[in-house]
Amino acid sequence: MYRRFIRPSLSGVALALGACVATDRNFTEPVNVDAQLRQAIDAYGVVPIAAVPAQDSALVALGRALFFDRELSGNRDVACATCHQPSTTMGDAQPLAVGTGGVGSGPSRTPGPGRTYVPRNAPTLLNAALGLPYVFLDGRITGFNGSFTTPAGGALPAGLPNVVAAQAMFPVTNRREMRGEAGDTDVFGRSNELALVGDSDWTGIWQAVTKRLLAIPAYVNAFQAAFPNTSPSQLGFQHAATAIAAFEMQQLTRTDSPFDRYLKRDDAALTPEQKRGALLFFGKATCSSCHNGPFLGGQGFADVGVPQVGPGLATQPPLDLGRGELPGNDFYQFAFRIAPLRNVELTAPYFHDGVYQTLAQVVHHYNDARTDLTTFDPATLRQDVRGMYHGDATTIAAVLNHLDFRLQQPLRLTATEQAELVAFLHSLTDASARDLSALRPATVPSGLPVP
């Protein structure tokens, strides 16, 4: 597992970066720009990402079917793909996700009668299977050296191969996302039996979903093909989660960006503007103090002063304390997982509640997080979530009270420098991730509509 890199005290690197960034942009790039940039990259542990292991084709095929099948949801109305669509780069382009009972699809989807938004944005699943230690925006699932920490504790079945499979166990247990409420009926008017299981009965929920799947002959055949040494009586939802993880690993790993090619010593892979942005990223802008390592993030948590929008969670509704919602994590109030930045250009809107639609807005926020939070204009929010903005003085003060130390002072980036940072972030895009429509199957074993 990659360690979390802390910003090194390398005065020589800092001086070199400062000198390069100060270069007059009306002239040719300095001849040593690549040497300076590579020195900075090395200082923050940014290395080429290793290829993921090839996955068994039958396992991937099963995982693909499960990912797109609404049979996994209590009301049979949503699938994993409802919030993680190929057409929106494996997210949903919504500021806040809309789970079971919603109306419409994609960016236009809204909560149905008696429903509300899921408290957080649906993050992209691109590159989710690369080996990041923390899953979900609050990191409530962790995976280190083959050992997992999850909300289910000892109820988590053995045999899960990786943290992505562990994560795949949980959306089906969440009432707002997929399971539904007691008294719900499914799309056929039948009682939602998954919703009748108690919230703490993890095993009961997973058994109920598995029972549904194994009532479909095509799934029985698909499970037998993917797990030939496991009898139907031994199958559990952990096998479904393993297949979903294999699908994500095989099909959603996209690591051939210009920056990846630059890491492999192709100096021409980045434009001069992108190189200037990279020097800012690893220098004056201090982005790399959080976004470091092979994935440029994903290895820690921070309160970065994001405006609070949404219905909130259990601890202090309507606020969302992020990692501070988890027991024993009071220090992390309003802190969320530091996002890995691969393909970030394609994954708007940004932050845990989707308050910013563009990377330019994100960079502007980081340039002076305190001011940006206190002057945030809710009119920039989509109208249907505008009423869930919590901009009172008490809330803003609470967020600022836990603001990460690296954002206490403005960065004082010029407009040109901010544009260069955005250009660098665009260099993290794998062109193959722009069109993922081929991942969507025409049909799924349940016969339900494919989202």
Name these PLM-found stretches:
Residues F5-R7, C20-P451:
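Periplasmic c-type cytochrome electron-transfer domains
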Residues S9-G18:
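Bacterial N-terminal signal peptides
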